[in-house]
Amino acid sequence: MAHATQVGLQDATSPIMEELISFHDHALMIIFLISFLVLYALFLTLTTKLTNTNITDAQEMETVWTILPAIILVLIALPSLRILYLTDEINDPSFTIKAIGHQWYWAYEYTDYGGLIFNSYMLPPLFLEPGDLRLLEVDNRVVLPIEAPVRMMITSQDVLHSWTVPSLGLKTDAIPGRLNQTTFTATRPGVYYGQCSEICGANHSFMPIVLELIPLKIFEMGPVFTL
């Protein structure tokens, strides 16, 4: 999870997040090189006296600065399109969980376990235990298995919300009257935090998401016992 003074992205807990971090580094390297070359050209322009203000035509230069940006855009677009395809791919999920956004809490339904339904509210500061995180803890965590593909079906009961867990690389809008879906496969056990990422009213900041990822064998004993 994120911590104070953190500069980089959160540690990846799914293959999709690993791909996103790699793409971030790839794009950042290209942007850094472009910025360096532009600043270097500006520096030379300001410091050298060997400038010619009478140039009216330079076909070679125009060809270069047309083709080069196109190549750079392709180098950025191709990895981005690959990740976009991976995020939309649904690979025979082992479990399906439904998340419903409300003002201002989340409701969850384990459709594969007899329709187990529960609400997840943020814990007020008075109920926090030592070591708990302010504005991020909930009364009922979402318990899911690791190393198994999980499908999240996300919708809203009232206004626009967004179900987001950064460590898993997930951000899916919850739209009234529409059922969006996303999949992920967690690679490490632990407790992971997220929040509603779509402004949804006065208490938008009080809609945390907490996932407790556990080994598959423990999960198969029954998620109801770990809530």
Curated annotation (Swiss-Prot):
Mitochondrial matrix side: 46-59
Gene3D superfamilies in the cross-refs: 1.10.287.90, Cupredoxins - blue copper proteins
Residue positions binding Cu cation A2: C196, E198, C200, H204
Disulfide bonds: none
Keyword Transport attributed: yes
EC number: 7.1.1.9
Localisation: Mitochondrion inner membrane
Segments traversing the membrane: 15-45, 60-87
Mitochondrial intermembrane face of the membrane: 1-14, 88-227
Cofactor info, note text: Binds a dinuclear copper A center per subunit.
Keyword Transmembrane: yes
Name used for this protein in its record: Cytochrome c oxidase subunit 2
Highest taxon, organism lineage: Eukaryota
Known role: Component of the cytochrome c oxidase, the last enzyme in the mitochondrial electron transport chain which drives oxidative phosphorylation. The respiratory chain contains 3 multisubunit complexes succinate dehydrogenase (complex II, CII), ubiquinol-cytochrome c oxidoreductase (cytochrome b-c1 complex, complex III, CIII) and cytochrome c oxidase (complex IV, CIV), that cooperate to transfer electrons derived from NADH and succinate to molecular oxygen, creating an electrochemical gradient over the inner membrane that drives transmembrane transport and the ATP synthase.
Required co-factors: Cu cation
Binding site for Mg(2+): E198
